[in-house]
Amino acid sequence: MLQSEKEFDYINIKLASPLRILQWSYRRLPNGQFIGEVQKSETINYRTFKPEMDGLFCERIFGPSRSFECACGKYKLIRYEGLICERCGVELTESRVRRHRMGHINLIYPVAHVWYTNSRPNYMALLLEVEQCEKNLNTSWQILRFSLPGIYDQVLRPILLSDHWPDSSIDEYLKTICKDFSTIALESSNIWAKKSKAWYQKIFEIYQELLYAKIETIYQFIEFIDNIDLTKQPTSVNFIFDYLENEKILDLMNPISLTNEITASQDPAQIDLVDPSRDIFLFLNTFPKKQHKELFRKLIRKSNTVKSLDDRIKRIKLASLAYFIAEDEISYYGLHWDLQQYRRSRELGFTAYPLKPEPKPKLQNRRYNTPKYLLRMTPTYLIGAVLIKKELEDLDIIKEIQRTRKFIVICSKILHKEKPIYHFLRWFRKWELQRAYKLRDQAIKRIRILENLLATGSNPAWMILTILPVIPPALRPMIQLEGGRFATSDLNELYRRIITRNNRLLRLLEIDAPQLIIRNEKRMLQEAVDTLIDNGKRGKIALSANNRPLKSLSDIIKGKHGRFRQNLLGKRVDYSGRSVIVVGPSLRLNECGLPYEMALELFQPFLIREMINQGLASNMKIARNLIEQNEAIIDPVLEKVLSNHPIFLNRAPTLHRLGIQAFEPILVQGRAIKLHPLVCSAFNADFDGDQMAVHIPLSLESQSECYMLMLAPYNFLSPANGEPIILPSQDMVLGCYYLTVSNIKGLLGSNQYFASLEDVLLAYNQDKIELHTAIWIRYTDNYIEPLNFKKQIQLNDASYIEIYENMQIRRDKDGNKIVQYLQTTTGRVIFNYTVQTTLNLLS
């Protein structure tokens, strides 16, 4: 078997496309047959103990169970290597190929990846600009929560509205909506009763976005019945329908750009998306109930001649019109309202969609009935992962990035109340400030996702799975135990559920089963895929036969015992050690205390080489003997080796890149690693028994990277948010406060005079003064303006002393300054001396 070694600088992780998943598993046999799809849920034959063909352990897909032996037994020798059996189709090769050959499952119905629908933040919600998407994208995968009782039982089969509805169905529905329906519908119908000359004279534009296609429909009333007495006008169905058609209410061929209209508008605050629509359909409700039945029939028949870009759009729009005519609570605020709100948020995004969702208008006290018949018009492809996939496919990543960037700039200007944006968009004042900040943060998260998708060349629609990869069988083994029993991986059970439900869904579609059963099967398929990817992510944990949680793919790779931390990051390596950490406040940020015994063992090869170079030993054996005897000549050589060789310190778990940092080692006694307390926050370490690992960089390149990139002082800012990560802790702040306190009186050695900082430290070490003793120290560097003059003392040599509140200045007879003393405390001297020593300010 050929093996190739390739050098690479980095690994690029991205979404896998359906084509890439097929490339992982699809292979073509010499007879022209394509293999790779797992079609059966069986694993092995319990009589022959051989893998089932096209099953989860199929030898034709994943390779032979025994090296150079086909499934049927026709070929068994190594001389047939590379041959494909013409009887069973198994390639004669080594059995270890079962560790990397993959298969796939063609899903009958697309399913959403649970990592992106139930994540925090919700990636699909950010991409589609739908708030609270995690509540909408549940296992039934209805992106629109209709909030209607019994919706799952009512939506049975899609019915084309363009077809002629049975009269019996229309009669039954109209009896429902017309029951107790008065001629005067709402307050607006009082005008009808009073025979007003002009009901409305108003020009407005109403934008109604519909879900499945990128088309906006404009409903217009232009010069509505100007100065016309409604009582003198014919009220026949023909008049109503002709009026609706003439006024272009039913014109479905008027797509407009809502974004452009709002941008061009001089006063966006006047755009009303609710009341004008209600006014239109309240007008329809002013006609007597006996005319509704005929009006409905005419609308349905006329729909055959209505031009539309797509039959689906026509169906939804006419259904919406029927809802409004019904003036029902659920019809007005049910399906149509959710369609409108979702499309508005999707098309306009956060730029023009109100930051505070529009509340549903209040209705009058009436009896409402659920229009079950109209609910059945909802096509099956308007719900589920198919719809989400369609919306994600329509995303133009480059345009979305540009639009989101503009919104972030505009939102920032509004939050800072910059002119003229803030005053031009007066309607922003109605929005809650916290919500504005929240949406700007969401836009920032969204642009990060979009830029990552663009950089990796990924399509967001790949978050919806149409082809499910099957990992190699050697990674999910089935082992035979004593007594004929088998121990198998949980992944086999999870894959078996998916294949079983997928095949059952295919069978239901072939026999044209009721939609209720098909939808339930789609839900079960989605749940099975969710459990395979991440069991428990949805909230419900799938259990095995003995009530044990099944181990999913996510459980295998995450956690302390997962593949990364257990087998990759936690491997034992050479030139490494481990010990408990203790505090070392006297160290610098770039230093750490390395125990002598550990340094002697870790740096032994470097130590031997240096001893040979200095002539202390003639060969490795003599040098090793000197080290074992712990001769005194070893110490200076070891210090020289350590002076130019950094080390890595790592604390598990390594959750971010600051979990591994470089330090310059300092030899210390004992067996514990000393660490500066300020660098503990990056490691998330404390001194209650934590352990850290030491690693030695061997090559010159790695050592140069330590000095240039990974030293602790160079990791001052957090890579996550740019905030300082090296900050003084509470005990440090309290210690600095206690060190510099100056209001304690009556202490040992008060009011003594000192010539320098070193004299103060010497007196403190000899216990002649205390930490908070008030002292006078000579100060000669810079002139300080004295304050609060108290008195002046004349001396015999004509000089005099000026005494201030915290200063004493001695001057000669001409007024020239001879010397000055500052009043301070011993603790402040220690603090000042430490700072100057660290900054190399002392001469």
Curated annotation (Swiss-Prot):
GO cellular component, one term: DNA-directed RNA polymerase complex
Cofactor note: Binds 1 Mg(2+) ion per subunit.
Oligomeric form and interacting partners: In plastids the minimal PEP RNA polymerase catalytic core is composed of four subunits: alpha, beta, beta', and beta''. When a (nuclear-encoded) sigma factor is associated with the core the holoenzyme is formed, which can initiate transcription.
Catalytic reactions of this protein: RNA(n) + a ribonucleoside 5'-triphosphate = RNA(n+1) + diphosphate
The name this protein goes by in its record: DNA-directed RNA polymerase subunit beta'
Keyword Zinc listed: yes
Binding site for Zn(2+): C70, C72, C85, C88
GO annotation, biological process: DNA-templated transcription
Cofactors: Mg(2+); Zn(2+)
Gene3D superfamilies: 1.10.40.90, 2.40.40.20, RNA polymerase II, clamp domain, RNA polymerase Rpb1, domain 3
Record keywords, A-Z: Chloroplast, DNA-directed RNA polymerase, Magnesium, Metal-binding, Nucleotidyltransferase, Plastid, Transcription, Transferase, Zinc
Location within or outside the cell: Plastid, Chloroplast
Function text: DNA-dependent RNA polymerase catalyzes the transcription of DNA into RNA using the four ribonucleoside triphosphates as substrates.
Positions bound to Mg(2+): D686, D688, D690
Family: Belongs to the RNA polymerase beta' chain family. RpoC1 subfamily.
Organism, scientific name: Trieres chinensis (Marine centric diatom)
SMART domains per record: RPOLA_N (SM00663)
EC number(s) stated in the UniProt entry for this protein: 2.7.7.6
Domain of life of the source: Eukaryota
GO molecular function, one term: zinc ion binding
